[in-house]
Amino acid sequence: MTSINVFAIIFSIAVSAIAIGIFCYPFFVKWQRDRLMAEQFPKSWLSIIESNLYVYSNLTSEQQKELQGYIQVFLKEKQFIGCLGLQITEDVKVTIAAIACLLLFGDRRTYFPNLRSILVYPHAYIVNELVMNDRYVVEERRVARLGESWTKDQLILSWEQVQQDIRNWQDGHNVVLHEFAHQLDQEDGQAEGVPILPRAMDYAVWSKVMTAEYLQLCDRVENGKKTVLDGYGATNPAEFFAVATETFFEKPKQLNQKHQDLYEILQRYYRLDPQQWQN
């Protein structure tokens, strides 16, 4: 057998092994996630979510069990990085994971696939940002931020803000829900307020409802009228989806009363009905 033939055989085996690996990898990931979902939930983690996740006690026992499984998979697959001296404790990781995983009930078993690392600052962090001033000149300014979702593999949060949101769940503001909603939106590589929808949902209906609600919010903000949705949602469709998600989970009854079509489409998307959680 010539050296060329040996090389061809080795190359063929290597290519076959790679192909088998690529084919089998999704099955391995599913097996690993199913195993994590079935594991006993740590008592220390349960204590944290019972204390820090306002709506946990309002979930059904089945939903609580499902959320626990999501949290275990999430914490296995995502890396937490403390910034500016912040120590990543169980409290930090489990609290953030519990809030973020509320968004996974809608059959999103990909677990924010673009996300690899969550950077957590002790408080608001400063970034340099290019902005246009009143004279239409672009200049660089230092801006304080509480959170940010990147289209590649990172998400940033202020732990101080996360703690504040825990204490004020029903105020309509939640940096974890907001930034992880952006992750859902960015899953297809675009940030345009249109996440990947379940098969049962229609993109045309989504677009019709979201566009109408977004334009209505823009009009009310421009005219100084009160809104259930935070005015920041009028920035662009991507921010509207993130703000609508916050409001859906934190002010569900008010959202349904004022924006029933929006509430119903988010209810179908997230497969939860937060109105049932409010007294």
Q: Model regions: which residues?
A:
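Metalloprotease/metallohydrolase-associated module, dominated by Zn2+-dependent proteases
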Residues: 95-112, 121-170, 190-279
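N-terminal signal-anchor transmembrane alpha helix of single-pass membrane proteins
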Residues: 1-33
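A metal-dependent hydrolase signature that marks the N-terminal structural subdomain at the beginning
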Residues: 28-143, 261-275
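Short, function-defining helix-loop hinge/capping sites that tune catalysis or transport
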Residues: 68, 186-190
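Active-site recognition of the HExxH zinc-binding catalytic motif
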Residues: 60, 171-187, 242
